């Protein structure tokens, strides 16, 4: 497992540094690795919805009303708390 991890790390390092050796600017290379439509709201949706829905899904199972309103989860996705604590 550790070997696979380090292989992936080295591949990512090579993926980023190879364009640098060809004269690319770091800011442009890193910007090219991130999707254009990635916004904080999409990241928040991805973190809240868990593994069922990803960043690129068109309609998450809840609505985000922005920072003031927060996110409203349907009852089946709300966390369940144990009483007594």
From Swiss-Prot:
The cysteine framework is C-C. Keywords: Acetylcholine receptor inhibiting toxin, Amidation, Disulfide bond, Hydroxylation, Ion channel impairing toxin, Neurotoxin, Postsynaptic neurotoxin, Secreted, Signal, Toxin. This is Alpha-conotoxin PrXA. The modification 4-hydroxyproline is found at residues 61, 75, 79. The modification Glutamic acid 1-amide is found at residue 83. Its main location: secreted. Residues 24-51 form a propeptide. GO terms for molecular function: acetylcholine receptor inhibitor activity; ion channel regulator activity; toxin activity. One of its GO terms (cellular component) is extracellular region. The keyword Secreted applies. It comes from Conus parius (Cone snail).
């Amino acid at each position: 497992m550790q070997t696979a991890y380090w292989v992936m790390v080295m591949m990512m390092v090579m993926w980023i540094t190879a364009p640098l050796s060809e004269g690319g600017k770091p800011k442009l290379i890193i910007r090219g690795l991130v999707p254009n439509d990635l916004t904080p709201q999409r990241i928040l949706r991805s973190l809240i919805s868990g593994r069922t829905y990803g960043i690129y899904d068109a309609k998450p199972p809840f609505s985000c009303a922005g920072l003031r309103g927060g996110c409203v989860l349907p009852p089946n996705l709300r966390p369940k708390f144990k009483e007594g604590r």
